[in-house]
Amino acid sequence: METASTPEATGTGKYIASTQRPDGTWRKQRRVKEGYVPQEEVPVYENKYVKFFKSKPELPPGLSPEATTPVTPSRPEGGETGLSKTAKRNLKRKEKRRQQQEKEAEALSRTLDKVSLGDTAQIPSALQGPQATPLAASDPSDSAATTEKAKKIKNLRKKLRQVEELQQRIQAGEVSQPSREQLEKLARRRVLEEELEDLELGL
């Protein structure tokens, strides 16, 4: 791309020669007044702070650019990078604890495989010690399942109550022409009762 050349003096004034645009088209030659500066050559205004920071060196005084090359840190001997001794010790403790829990869980599963459901009185005394904690840990999941069942029971009772109310309204004559959904609700009553019975027996 050709850039705008400086205005050329002719007999009647100055001209800016024709130039090529970035897209390949040509600008016409233009006649300009005395003292005209093309837009591309006008310096961009910079306030004093911008000028100060541009003139300011990036490095502190007296520091050579060679001294600022980044240094790659050497890896510490214990595989974890950047950890203190205490943090490494804590990691080792956690790892040992995790391995211990895995061993306890394996031992518990082996003893549970050996013991049948009918022989609950013959559970080894080894389970009474530290291995009783995995059983206690499973209690929250059991309680979550129990609360889930309780919610389902409550929901089913609510649906049954709605079905009974609908049936009473139909019998009282409040609803003369029940809609299709209402009839489906009435038809589902037996299924809801059976499901409620199953859940209550499961608790």
From Swiss-Prot:
Name the residue ranges with Low complexity bias.
132-147
Region named Disordered: 1-32, 55-149
Q: Which GO terms describe its biological process?
A: exon-exon junction complex disassembly; nuclear-transcribed mRNA catabolic process, nonsense-mediated decay; positive regulation of translation
Q: Which UniProt keywords apply?
A: Acetylation, Coiled coil, Cytoplasm, Nonsense-mediated mRNA decay, Nucleus, Phosphoprotein, Translation regulation
Provide the residue span(s) of the region labelled eIF2A-like. Answer: 151-203
Q: Which GO terms describe its cellular component?
A: cell junction; cytosol; exon-exon junction complex; nucleolus; nucleoplasm
What ranges does the record list as Basic and acidic residues composition bias? 98-113
Subcellular localization, as worded in the UniProt entry: Cytoplasm; Nucleus, Nucleolus; Nucleus, Nucleoplasm
Chain positions found as N-acetylmethionine = M1
Residues folding into a coiled coil are: 82-117, 144-203
Q: Does the keyword Ligase apply?
A: no
**Biased composition range(s): Basic residues:** 86-97
The Polar residues compositionally biased stretches are 122-131
Matching Pfam families, A to Z?
Answer: Mago-bind
Region annotated Required for interaction with MAGOH and RBM8A, chain positions? 1-33
A GO molecular-function descriptor: ribosome binding
- Tell me which residues bear Phosphoserine: S64, S116
In the record, Phosphothreonine modifications are located at: T72
Q: Which family does it belong to?
A: Belongs to the pym family.
Q: What does this protein do?
A: Key regulator of the exon junction complex (EJC), a multiprotein complex that associates immediately upstream of the exon-exon junction on mRNAs and serves as a positional landmark for the intron exon structure of genes and directs post-transcriptional processes in the cytoplasm such as mRNA export, nonsense-mediated mRNA decay (NMD) or translation. Acts as an EJC disassembly factor, allowing translation-dependent EJC removal and recycling by disrupting mature EJC from spliced mRNAs.
What does its UniProt record remark on the domains?
A: The eIF2A-like region shares sequence similarity with eIF2A and mediates the interaction with the 40S ribosomal subunit and the 48S preinitiation complex.
Assembly notes:
Interacts (via N-terminus) with MAGOH and RBM8A; the interaction is direct. Associates (eIF2A-like region) with the 40S ribosomal subunit and the 48S preinitiation complex.
Q: What is this protein called?
A: Partner of Y14 and mago
Query: What's the source species for this entry?
Result: Mus musculus (Mouse)
Originating gene: Pym1
